Each structure stands twice: as C-alpha cells, then as structure tokens.
C-alpha cells in the first residue's frame, strides 16, 4: 500500500472516513434548487463518442484506480443514475494503466443485451475492440453456472491476466448463495462465491465490483454474505451467529443499536452510496393505496380455499421454508383468489374446481388428492402420462376455464344490449365526472348490467383497475405476479370488454425475446408518448429488472409481493432519469396505484397479510440499509443530494480521537475481539453528536505561512475544512485564554490532525 493511502484495518484506521472526504473533496455534489421553468432534461448534453462520467462516477473511478489498494466495492446507487456505466468507467481507467485484464461480468442472461449496449456506449473509443475483447458475460442464474464459470476463468487465453469481476444485481446472486447454503440442494452459486472469496484474499490485483440499487431482499444475513465476499471474514459464516450479534432477538424490528457501530466500522471502505432524486430529472411520484371489498361470490370461493390452506398447513407444514413468509406455496390458493375467482358455469367449471398445476399435486400428495379428486382425474387420465403430457392437459384445462369465462360474459353483454345497456355508457359516465369515486360508482351501477355484475363477482379489483386505467390520462404500466389464469390471461378478457385494445405484454411467458423487445420499443417510441400505438403495457416479475420504460403516467400494481423491494423495482421501471422528457413539464408525473382486496368483516385477506409481512420485513432491512448508507465511503461527498428520502448522519470518529497521538484501528480482524474493545465512532455508547456553531476564519498552520479559510468553533477550538466536514486541527489558547493568532485577522492552528501527512497527489485524484 502506498504510504499516502489509509485502510480502516490499520493503526491509523480511524482517520479513514475523513481521509476519503478530504482527498476527494473536489467530487462533492451540491444540491441544485429546483426551478419548474427550467427543463433540465433538455439541458443534458449528448457528447459524441464515449460519454464522460459524472462527478459521483469519476470519484469511484479514481478511488479504485490501478494504483489504489481499494479492490472491492458495493456500488449501491439508485435507479437510473448509471450503476452499469460506473463499473465500465472504473474498467476504462484500469485498462488505461494496464491492458492486461479479464473482465468477468456475472449477470442474468436476460440482461446480456443491455450490458452489451452499455459497453458500446461507455467504453472509451481508444483501443475499443481490445477493451471489449477482454469482457466475458457469465449467466449466474443458469443451471450449470458454476461449470461455465470455471471453464471461462480457466481458459488458457485468460490465464496470466488481472481479473475484474462485476456482479450485476448482486442481491440476486447473494440470494442464490443463501439458498445454496441453507437448502444444500445445489451449490452452483456457492461455488462461484467461494472462488471469488479465495481469489480476493490470495491475489492482490483482483478486483470485485458489486452493483445493486437494493442490496438486501429477504433477511439481514444477506448483507453478511455480501460483505464477506468483499472483505472475507468480517462477519460470522453462520446466520444464527450474525443475528445474535446484530439483532436483539428473533422478533427485532431494527438493527441492534448496541452493535450498529460494530457493523458500520467493519464495512468501512466497502460501499459507495448515491441516490440523487432531483425533481428536475425525474417525474413526480404519487402513491395511492386502494382497498376494495370482495364480492359475496368471491368471498365464498376465497373461504373455500382458505379452509384448504388451513388443512394443508396443519398436515404439510414441513414444506414451508424456515421463514414461512416468502415461499410461493404459502397461501398460494387465496393469493390467487384475491385477484380473481372463476364464475360458476357448471358443476365442472367453477371457482372451487379451478385446475391446479401438477407440482402442487406431487408436493402435497395425500392431502391434495383428498380435496381435488377432479384434478387428479384431469391430470392422470393415463397412469403413465409423461410430464409433458400432464402439462399439456393442465394447460388445456386452464384455457378451457378462461374461454368459458369469455363466452359467459359475451352472453351477458348480449343480454345487456337487448336491454339497451352497454358498458361503454358507464365508462362515459365515469369519465365525465372526475369527482366520482370508482368504488361507489361500481357498487351503485353493477346490478344494472349483467356484464358488469359478472365481472364484479369474479374480481372487483380488476374491474376497478380497468375503470381506473380508462379514467386516467396517458400511458399505463400494469404489474401482476401472474401471467396465466388470475393474472394477465384474465386481465385481457376484461380489456376486451372494456375495449382497451392498445395494450402490449412484456413477460417471460413470451419466449421470443424479439417480440418482447418489439413491444417495449413500440411503447417507448417518442411518437407513442400519448399512447397512439400502445397505451398499456403489462409486465410480470421476470421483467422487473433491466427493463426501462418511458412516458408512463400511471402504474397499477395488482397485488402485493413478499418483498417491497420488488414493488420498488416495478415503479423504478417507469420513473428513471429523464424518462419523461418527451412530455410537457406539467405532465411529468406518475400515479402509482397499489390494489388490495379486503373482506367485509375485519379478518385480513392474504393480500393484507402479505403486505403486512412485507412491510415489517422492509422496515427491519431498512434499518440495516440506513447503517450502510451512513458508513459509505462517499457519505459526506454526496449527503446533500442523497437525503431526499430522509436525513441521516455520516459515520464519524470523535474529534478528540482524530487528534490523538495514538489513532487506532477502525476495526479488528476478529469480530469477537472487536466486541470486547471499547467502541469508538458514531452510534457507540461513548459517542455523542452535537450541533455546533462555526464561523469562517483565516488561519495558518504552525509550520506554514500560507493563509487559508476554515470553519472555526470557538468553544472547542476545532477547525474544519472550508469545503467539507473534515476536522483539520485545533487552535490552542494563549496564557490570556484567547485563541492563538499570528496577527489581528489570522489564527494559528497548532494542533493538527494527521490528514496532511496522507494527502494524495493530484494525479491520483
């Protein structure tokens, strides 16, 4: 390590947070006031050739340059601010120093094209082909990911080069690792993870960049796994040990405040955080939660499935995951019934006999068979039926149900026409008065129309959403967890009768990627900003990452998800930097509707239960993420623009510690040794945060005649840098108890911090 670089785990480690801020202060980003009359998106220049990094990207580029000892980082940057570009910029500078690189990008297969597009955009033009030839895309989600990974890194042409690993959407990779550790059914992600840990420990030139806007999904220990990848051994390898340290108990709703300081000290140097949600660059967002009562018929079918789930739960609880909250099996029946229940058409086709996929029958045999004999008969017409044949039978049964609904509603529509009633007349009535409440409107008019009543009985939620889409202005995004049956497949029937014809689908059920991309391109076409070609696009969970949409005015989230992060990702698809630049400034706003079905009594539905579980989980994880943000290397540099979602204080060590002759380590190698030591820094029992008044002074240091401006607190004598919140030293008092001064207007800083000894040369920053 260069003499001028400081690491947190050295005997001067407590200087590290101040050292970063002091040496890289020229990258500090200040908040600019919002002027509704200035279109910032039109001011964004499009330079020819490779685009230049923004200050927060250039900071990381220089921080991780070839000469730097800092080799691992989590790029925890917000949606739409250029995380991918940041990692490419880092590679650009590394390549400029040495061309001898392998760049392994671990990413989902569906995001390959997006990465290639970004590489073409952000790689420097000089030696472009050579830069690109160093890059290898690896799908970490494939069934043979570990084998493919080994093949690529062991290829003879790649041996002898320095390795740069970029892990995109690292939260998904870590989730796979966690699953491997706990289930022990597969080790493909774990093998890659362990290889990376070994390499970062054994090879000083290897670098790892992890990218995520949402670094943790399900449980706090995922952060333990992530940071153990970036700095092996800083957290326990077992989840129970990690939780015992950082949670008070298994019911904790926040990080253990007694050990928050320990957590933050151990991750110093591992995170860059940047959010910057500038009003002028992003559409304004409004969130509305809509609770809708079940129809009587829906509640009857829902109760039927709830009884089944209770029976399954008692007899087959072993099939639940340990947490019991995020498995797809948990409340699967009632979860679907919250969206839609099939109407009673005859004794074979009705809400209670909805076909179920074969996996449920197999995983819950002995219970399911007693309850759904018609399913067993349907799926096992031949005892020797192959899996593909069973799947075909199941799909045909589902399609029969869906087509039966459409035929039934067509008969209702025909009956309405005979009575001179049309759904369009109700649509026109609702659109003519924007003060009408949709719930009240539906309840008032549903019995006047057989079609509307039929739609209402099956799903008041989807009926409400359709009226809402038509009433709103501009293009819409619809998100549902389901593609078939209670999801997009049924929504399309509602759309048909509502005459919503200009819609597109973008989900994993559409196998041909070109068709999906054609839909997205058409929706995003600037000429489609008012929905002339497509005014609704429907997406599923598979498309919540790596897909950018433009000119969306309203988002409809049909049901909750176990992870609020998933919902945030959906919203993030439609609100990105300058994603609404083709619209007039007064139309750059997005309304997000979250729909929840409820009973007429107070008993919670699965919609409400999932939302409560997700909210509680999110709130716990958010306390850990808050700690991560506070400990970010660039916290002081970007704090001013990062606090749109609430204020926070950057992690610091006490001023007196930084002026001490014996500075000390920020953390010790062994976490249990660290627990025994006296905690220092923010959130420790010995640390107190105070607001102090400062005023600007001119001063010299005791060994220099150069006069500079500083901020000065007369009560403590502390002197701070004029540009950033960094302690420079202290002005002592003379025998008359007055601050020491060289002349009438110039103070003398006699007790200096060690920062100047570790100042980087200009060429390094």
Model-based region annotation:
Residues 1-69, 78, 85-211, 215-536, ...:
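Helicase-associated low-complexity regulatory tails and linkers flanking the ATPase motor
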Residues 75:
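Hydrophobic anchor at the beta1->P-loop junction of P-loop NTPases
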Residues 72:
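Residues immediately within or flanking Cys/His clusters that coordinate Zn2+
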């Amino acid at each position: 390590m260069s003499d001028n670089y400081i690491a947190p785990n050295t005997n001067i480690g407590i200087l590290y947070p101040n050292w970063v801020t002091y040496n890289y202060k020229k990258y500090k980003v200040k908040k600019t006031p919002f002027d509704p009359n200035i279109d910032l998106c039109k001011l964004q220049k499009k330079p020819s050739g490779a685009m230049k990094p923004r200050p927060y990207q250039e900071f990381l580029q220089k921080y991780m340059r070839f000469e730097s000892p800092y080799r691992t980082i989590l790029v925890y940057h917000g949606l739409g601010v250029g995380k991918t570009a940041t990692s490419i910029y880092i590679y650009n500078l590394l390549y400029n120093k040495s061309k001898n690189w392998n760049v392994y990008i671990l990413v989902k297969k569906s995001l390959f094209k997006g990465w290639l597009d970004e590489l073409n955009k952000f790689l420097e033009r000089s030696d472009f082909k050579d830069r690109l030839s160093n890059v290898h895309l690896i799908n970490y989600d494939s069934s043979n990911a570990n084998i493919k990974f080994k093949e690529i890194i062991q290829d003879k042409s790649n041996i002898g080069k320095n390795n740069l690993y970029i892990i995109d959407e690292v939260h998904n990779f870590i989730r796979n690792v966690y699953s491997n550790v706990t289930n022990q059914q597969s080790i493909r992600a774990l093998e890659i993870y362990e290889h990376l840990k070994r390499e970062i420990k054994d090879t000083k030139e290897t670098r790892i960049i992890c990218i995520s806007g949402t670094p943790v999904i399900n449980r706090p220990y995922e952060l333990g796994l992530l940071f153990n990848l970036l700095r092996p051994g800083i957290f326990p390898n077992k989840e129970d040990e990690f939780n015992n340290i950082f949670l008070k108990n298994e019911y904790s709703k926040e990080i253990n405040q007694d050990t928050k300081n320990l957590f933050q000290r151990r991750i110093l140097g591992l995170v860059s955080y940047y959010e910057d949600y500038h009003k002028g660059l992003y559409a304004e967002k409004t969130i509305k939660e809509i609770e809708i009562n079940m129809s009587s018929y829906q509640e009857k079918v829902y109760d039927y499935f709830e009884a089944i789930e209770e029976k399954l739960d008692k007899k087959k609880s072993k099939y639940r995951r340990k947490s019991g909250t995020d498995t797809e099996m948990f409340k699967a029946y009632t979860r679907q019934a919250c969206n839609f229940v099939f109407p009673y058409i005859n004794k074979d086709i009705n809400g209670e006999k909805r076909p179920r996929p074969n996996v449920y029958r197999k995983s819950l045999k002995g219970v399911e068979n007693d309850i759904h004999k018609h399913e067993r008969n349907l799926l096992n017409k031949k005892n020797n039926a192959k899996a593909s044949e069973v799947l075909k039978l199941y799909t045909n049964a589902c399609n029969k149900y869906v087509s039966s609904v459409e035929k039934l509603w067509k008969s209702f529509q025909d009956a309405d026409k005979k009575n001179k009633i049309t759904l369009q007349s109700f649509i026109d009535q609702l659109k003519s008065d924007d003060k009408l409440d949709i719930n009240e409107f539906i309840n008032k008019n549903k019995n006047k129309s057989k079609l509307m009543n039929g739609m209402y009985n099956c799903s008041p939620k989807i009926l409400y959403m359709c009226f809402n889409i038509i009433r709103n202005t501009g293009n819409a995004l619809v998100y549902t967890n389901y593609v078939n049956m209670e999801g997009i497949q049924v929504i399309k029937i509602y759309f048909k009768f509502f005459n919503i014809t200009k819609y597109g689908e973008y989900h994993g059920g559409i196998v041909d990627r070109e068709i999906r991309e054609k839909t997205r391109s058409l929706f995003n076409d600037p000429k489609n900003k008012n929905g002339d070609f497509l005014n609704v696009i429907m997406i599923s969970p598979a498309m919540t990452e790596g897909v950018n949409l433009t000119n969306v005015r309203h988002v409809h989230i049909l049901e909750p998800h176990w992870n609020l992060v998933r919902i945030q990702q959906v919203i993030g698809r439609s609100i990105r930097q300058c994603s609404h630049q083709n619209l007039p400034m007064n139309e750059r706003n997005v309304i997000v509707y979250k729909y929840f079905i409820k009973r007429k009594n107070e008993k919670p539905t699965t919609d409400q239960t999932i939302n409560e579980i997700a909210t509680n989980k999110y709130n716990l994880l958010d306390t850990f993420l808050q700690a991560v943000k506070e400990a970010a290397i660039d916290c002081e540099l970007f704090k001013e623009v990062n606090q749109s979602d609430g204020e926070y204080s950057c992690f610091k060590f006490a001023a007196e510690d930084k002026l001490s002759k014996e500075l000390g380590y920020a953390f010790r190698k062994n976490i249990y040794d660290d627990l025994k030591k006296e905690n220092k820094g923010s959130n420790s029992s010995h640390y107190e945060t105070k607001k102090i008044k400062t005023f600007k002074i001119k001063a010299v240091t005791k060994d220099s005649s150069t006069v500079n401006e500083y901020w000065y607190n007369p009560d403590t004598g502390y002197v701070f840098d004029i540009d950033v919140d960094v302690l420079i030293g202290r002005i002592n008092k003379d025998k008359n108890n007055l601050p020491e001064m060289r002349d009438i207007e110039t103070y003398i800083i006699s007790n200096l911090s060690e920062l100047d000894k570790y100042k980087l040369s200009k060429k390094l920053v």
